[in-house]
């Protein structure tokens, strides 16, 4: 199992507009301590939207 203090934890990215959780990725906590936002394709919307890290 992963440690709670893992440097590269798994995070889930959810679409800001439709709230669907579309992507799972990893991030480096030292470089990005805040929640990350990426512009990715949302299959439900059919276009690129902002996806924000969920907890």
Swiss-Prot record:
Q: Does the keyword Heme apply?
A: no
| Claim: Ribonucleoprotein is one of the keywords in the record | yes
What's a Gene Ontology MF term here?
structural constituent of ribosome
Entry GO CC: cytoplasm; ribonucleoprotein complex; ribosome
Q: Any one Gene Ontology biological process term?
A: translation
Q: What InterPro entries does the database record attribute to this sequence?
A: Ribosomal_bL33, Ribosomal_bL33_CS, Ribosomal_bL33_sf, Ribosomal_zn-bd
Q: Which keywords does the record carry?
A: Ribonucleoprotein, Ribosomal protein
HAMAP family per record:
Ribosomal_bL33
Query: Family per UniProt?
Result: Belongs to the bacterial ribosomal protein bL33 family.
**Designated name of the protein:** Large ribosomal subunit protein bL33B
Please name the gene that encodes this protein: rpmG2
């Amino acid at each position: 199992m992963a440690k709670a203090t893992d440097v590269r934890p798994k995070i889930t990215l959810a679409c800001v507009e439709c709230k669907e959780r579309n992507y799972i990725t990893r991030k480096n906590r030292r470089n990005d301590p805040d929640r990350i936002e990426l512009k990715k394709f949302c299959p439900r919307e059919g276009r690129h939207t902002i996806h924000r890290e969920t907890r």
